[in-house]
């Protein structure tokens, strides 16, 4: 006998005899293994009495008559006799029995009763090794029922952190390979594989002949599909588990867990191939697929359906009341939908462009101006967003037809209407209509400011890009942003646009086409700084890229002592103006938005500057398709003319169909200039050798001439912000069905002071064990009305018996910090839930 075991027995006995009151402990040592050691045991506060098959009456007299006060260890080196042969049975009933075998000691330690002990005895080898035994003990089960002990043994062998059947199930699935399953083999070594399959039936309702892991995987996915799709092929019916609530809870937990997501994806792909699921589900109405999240092919089928509808120009198409943009937004947040986020973004924006197929332009320039900066600029933004997504596709060829349709509608139904309308009644007087003018920018936006003002001029940032920047800046709780439009100069190109933004009393273009500000040149940074400092001595000009590389102290020095600082940013035009990178111009737009927003935050935080104005010298036109010869206007200008694809400046106007002219004196508000600018009245270009053709500017269109002006004011210190909250709308007191739908509401719209977040919502028991599937809620809605922020969640409960006397809870956690944000107690009143069949 090992010393460890001997000491353990002595400690156990002494612990028992240390209790208050008299203690009689009967020890039936079946094989007499401890007969030679028992007398030497250093028992405290107890006597040792040897029981023999023939001294039962003598023992009874001793214990009950001769010495009724002392504690006794009654040791018998033989098995306990049957009741009818045991004259000490009545004494044993009010005494304690002691067992010294390892299982008995373990049961004594943990308080395991007879039924749990029987399970341990059957699988004694599992806890026969110290590491496994310690793992089993560490689970600290609340109750040692047969099911609980069996589950703990499964988890012990599978090396799970907790004793939940779902943990063992997940480990079995994760360990599976085409050739073997080490975890299941390990269970089989201890004859626990049959226990595992038994629990698959009792916990999940998985019962098939000759069960194996492949069939189990199929059952899990078929059961999930049957729940969301409602109708499944007959061949799949035998695999539908009888307890879908438990299956859904397990599948959601694995799918949404960052640690197991990749394994879930691999399992889903394998089952999808085995079932030929894509072909089977393709035969179902698409309405049935919109809530299915467990197989990647569902998103393929839905994006395919959307593509077909858009190619047919069916913008009224809907599934279950959701139109294509709504469906794209929701599906892009699902598990497999996130992997197709680019496709969904492309399709959502394609829908908006296709919806413009019947675009009607206002009648004249002034109405185009008003409608453009309020609404129509969004079409240009959506066109840009379409190509931003399209260019990220791994296999864009699948969407060639849709891309061609988008391109055709944008060019022939939108640009071909809005630009001619813009050039109808284009202002001919020096005031250029009633619009705010770019040439008055400094006097109206900068000159009157008492605080330091930083002006960021982003080359070619057209109005819709400025609107995106304004939206991004507005998300900062410390900023206030106001976006307004200004009418740029014509021709809408860099030299003239940059000049118009500087302080001046007179702007001029010489016969050699040089632009002067109050007789001063202004083509480069040094010249522009000289012009600016002439009006504001405490001012300066700097390139954006130079600021980016500066350390904090150097950056602060740029602004110290300055009243006005002009920062020149060149991301969009730098990419668009080069033939080999012009198709990257839309990507450059997003980069420009992000880096300008970041720079504003950096300057505000490091240079004690709180007022910023962001604007542009001009906008641009971009079309992806290759220009046809019919889109090009013959260049009849003399060689001395200033010729660009979108304008020609010369002493005389160009007399060509589709070309209009405007005196530069009108543009510059001067009476002395004798030059004339000629420009296409549509999206056409002049024939010019070399250079790119898709990205152009300089002409007369809303896209080229309406420039954004963002007035941004940052606040010192921190502004209090809150995270959006989740509110239960449905009246919830009792759950009476294994499948329940509840209405929730995001309590406030997302704003500069209310941050978005993600919630995980499910039901738990009083021990915090999850009893339902888990819903992932991305709370990012900006709708002002409560109805726009409401949504419905479906919960499927585990198929088991619920006690309507015990508390259960609906809980929600903020996924970013795991803080519980909602707990609502409910009564689970589901009659015989464990027996529900839920046939499919």
What annotation goes with each model-predicted range?
Residues 1-453, 462-612, 616-840:
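…; additionally, a secondary subgroup of soluble metalloenzymes is captured
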Residues 456:
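Beta1/beta-strand and adjacent pyrophosphate-binding region of the FAD-binding site
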Residues 459:
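Ligand-binding pocket scaffold of soluble enzyme catalytic domains
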